Amino acid sequence: MIKASKCNKPRALFLVRVSIPRTFIRNATSAVPTTIKLNDLASLPPITKSLPTNLPFLMPDTLQSLLRFDSEKEKQPSTDKSNDKDKPSRKEKGKDKEKENEEKKDINMDEKYEINEETDTKPTIDPNNPVSSKSNISSSSGGDNNNNNNNNNNNNDSDGKNDDGSPKDKEFLSPSDSGLHPPFLAIAMKDRPFLPGATRHLHVSDPEVIKCVNHMINSNIKSPYFVLFHVRDTNSEDAALDVIKDRDFVHEVGTLCQIIKTTGSEILVYPHYRVKLVDISTPNSRSESIEKEQDNSQTSYLKKFEVSYAVTQQLKDEPYDEQSITINAWTRRIKELYEKLAPKYDQPENKEEIMSNPSMLADFIASKVHAKPEQIQEILESSNVETKLELSLQLLQVEADADEMRQTALKNIRERTEKAYAQSLIKEYTKELLKAAGIGENSKVHKFDERIKHLKMPEEAMKAYKTEKERLGTQSDMEQNVVERYLDWLTQIPFGVYTKDSFNVKKAREILDRDHYGLKDVKDRILEFISVGKISGNVDGKILCLAGPPGTGKTSIAKSIAEALNRKYTRIAVGGVQDVHDVKGHRRTYVASIPGRIVTALTQAKTSNPLMLIDEIDKLDTTSHGGAARAFLEILDPEQNNSFVDNFIEVKVDLSKVLFVCTANYLGSIPGPLRDRMEIIEVNGYTKNDKIEITKRHLIPAAAKKVGLDEGRVVIPDETISRLIDKYCRESGLRHIKSLINRIFSKASRKIVEELEETDVDSHNKDTVEGTLVAKESEKVISDKAKIDTENSPIEYIQSNTEVKAETTTESQQEQEKEKEKDEEIKKLDLPADLKIEVKPETLKDFVGPEIYIKDRLYETLNPGVATGLAYNTSGDGDALYIESILTDSISSDLGNAGLHVTGSLKDVMKESASIAYSFAKQFMVRQFPDNRFFEAAHIHVHCPGGAIPKDGPSAGIAFTSSLVSLALNKSLPNDTAMTGEITLTGKVLAIGGLREKSLGAKRAGYTKIIFPKDCEYQLDEIPDEVKEGLTYIPVEWYSEVFEHLFQGISKEEGNSVWKEEFAKLEDKKKSKKTNTK
């Protein structure tokens, strides 16, 4: 009778209980070695069921023969008396002895049956869960493999060796307690580590490793296994090697892999489970213990190759609670995320088994997601199932987030594409409806037609308009947009639209005087220009250029001219423009092309005769072959600009009616051909008196209005303004002084607010004290009343008190919100009528900081060799320029290095002036004082203080000469005299520029006499009387005249004897040298 029952444990074998005669049992058990137990089978798993069935598997029948053991006793095949039953000698014994043996065998079989019954109830080996290495093999494969293994062991040859010399399977029995594997081929890998449970492709490049793998396959080795370890430093030069150099070269934990198929250097492997590195033998360092055990190992063939092989031990998972809340939560979350990403991955055949095993699930997820090798190695090394799940979940979450972002991006792209497609369909549909209805062009064409009704377009422009208009509706969307944009620009150009000029000189004078103080010469020139226009009836073809320092009001003057002429004002800033297309536009073939700045300015002005200000024309970038400058040659030429063609419009535009006004700081930067086309009007810097008046009339009222103060709240006397100009802003313009005035009003506003707040705080504190006393009295009365009410009815008191508090709270909240809204409303502060702040010269530094210009002069008393020149810069500021000359060595030193050395950041022109002055000074001294041989032995160092400031210009010649002559005569120059002018080798004094600004600088520094070239006398008429007041101008033509003014009363004897003693010492030295030489 046979009874079968299923075990409760998952994947357990069916237990079969059979009642069989003992004689049958004796005959059946005689063929089975009694020493082999099911729980002693190999820990290495058989081939996994999840592999493809069509692959040529190269694997042994059993894996238990691959383990090594430490116990020699376990290596010996155990015997049993039951095995002797089959021998012929047994049959010759007596019946009594035979019965006795049969009874013993029955007892042994009963014991074996009990042992087998216990082992049969254990879980079988899971092919996809190699961690449970000590479990039984499955009923479908384990029993067959066991029988086959026994048969193989019984049929081994007598020599016990394979053809290649490796031991037969019979030499490898059950593992010892240590559970160490025999030496396996060890391979290092740089890429992502392999996790158990999934087939992978491995690429090897080392020839010895390839030979070894091929030998394992071709020789039918029953152990096609190797261990795979990940390299620690993947950035090292040896990271790509397959052979392990030493133990520290790889991580301690790797995977045991089975070779399934090889194709050249590619190996298809199946990682079974984790292993830990115990010992390793490398080609550079062989391990004695491994080499000794290799002689009795089935993998001894590895010694034939220059490869690394290692002894490893299976790394099992730590026990865990299947009911753990954390594990179950993470497992559930992983399953949820995996289901979302499942279409991306290949689904395994044993998916249900993987999903039910947390450890297998962690490995499976980690093998699928994108991650760095270090992250995968961390999961591989972890034996804690909970940790593995956490790490795998983190990687899967990142994968899910990235996939969600990708899906969102694709969705947005799809929606935009569908929307654009729908709009395109609607647009085409609308066009067809309009065309079928005979309505004609869309509303844009109607808008263009309405525009040209108010224009007097020339024939060429009208022809271009009609041609492009006909193209509408017949082009693609891209061409359609280009045509519409062209028509839009073309119909905005004000063809034939003009404003009527006003030539009222009186009105123009009023406007100029209203907006500007001073600048008499500039105003006169502008009024003359308007008067000529009134007589001729037009101001066509005029190009003005206002040249002057920054901040002198050139731009505002242009606005005033436009207002005086009743013309529209438009401005073009060309500073830094280098591309001609910025001026003349791009052709329509370019994407997003537009007209140039000239046509754009016309469309903004909406008239064909505006005043067009071309600002900063001296800062045109001329480095790119002068492209933009060449474009302005056509625009500013009255003979050519009546047919200006923009590259975008491609139609002639008349610019002859435009009044061009250019501004520049330095005329020398404007190309010569362009400068010749302009009528130059110089806008000189303001004098000190001009600055004071402009500050009082314009700057102070504007600053007061800006901060919201009435005029008179902040009082700035003339003395304060004068000190502000002298000590803070000496430039010719007004920008810096304007910023300082604004700063004064900002500081004054702050002082006013702080003073008012202090007053409010004092009054608030007083009100608070009185309010506190009243509140305390009220609280006392309320508490007494409440006490009486509570004694009468506590419940009614509580209820009524609660209602009162609620009503009070609601009312107080509403009041607070209203007050908050009132506070948020910005209101102008009411100031007391008597509140004023006066800025005195003594308190000026409290508003604008410490003084910038402390001293007006560098030298109060000039030393011999120091001369005072005058300089002028492009910002319109004039100042004293000191020139110092000294002897570097005494004349009697006899060094023989006479010459000149110049410093002070001088440019080429000033260096030439110094060299010319040195040559002329030597000639002049020889002619005037022949016995003064100063320049024959003197090495002179000439320096201009302020080396950080570059200096250049042809106006310091006489100052250099005077400095050298002063040093040669050892006589100081007058303290009250400054000079300017260039000199030639013959002593001629040449003309210079900027005498007005230099006069301002000399007067500010305290000089009362100015020596200047006689050829510049005409400039005196341009200098205001207030500047010339207190100054004496000395015109000179030759340097001899300069010498007479600077060195009055010096005789020839005095000049010849200046260095007489030094030269006597020099002669004595020369004589002594000759004597010593003889």
From Swiss-Prot:
Residues 127-157 have a biased composition (Low complexity). It catalyses: Hydrolysis of proteins in presence of ATP. Residues 182-400 form the Lon N-terminal domain. Keywords: ATP-binding, DNA-binding, Hydrolase, Mitochondrion, Nucleotide-binding, Protease, Serine protease, Transit peptide. The active site is at S955, K998. GO terms for cellular component: mitochondrial matrix. It comes from the Eukaryota. Residues 71-123, 158-172, 815-825 have a biased composition (Basic and acidic residues). Pfam families: AAA (PF00004), Lon_C (PF05362), Lon_lid (PF22667), LON_substr_bdg (PF02190). It is an enzyme of class 3 (hydrolase). One of its GO terms (biological process) is oxidation-dependent protein catabolic process. GO terms for molecular function: ATP binding; ATP hydrolysis activity; ATP-dependent peptidase activity; sequence-specific DNA binding; serine-type endopeptidase activity; single-stranded DNA binding. Its main location: mitochondrion. Residues 1-27 form a transit peptide. Residues 71-179, 792-825 are annotated as: Disordered. Residues 861-1049 form the Lon proteolytic domain. Its EC number is 3.4.21.53. InterPro entries: AAA+_ATPase (IPR003593), ATPase_AAA_core (IPR003959), Lon_bac/euk-typ (IPR004815), Lon_lid (IPR054594), Lon_proteolytic (IPR008269), Lon_Prtase (IPR027065), Lon_prtase_N (IPR003111), Lon_prtase_N_sf (IPR046336). NCBIfam families: lon. Belongs to the peptidase S16 family. Homohexamer or homoheptamer. Organized in a ring with a central cavity. ATP-dependent serine protease that mediates the selective degradation of misfolded, unassembled or oxidatively damaged polypeptides as well as certain short-lived regulatory proteins in the mitochondrial matrix. May also have a chaperone function in the assembly of inner membrane protein complexes. Participates in the regulation of mitochondrial gene expression and in the maintenance of the integrity of the mitochondrial genome. Binds to mitochondrial DNA in a site-specific manner. This is Lon protease homolog, mitochondrial.
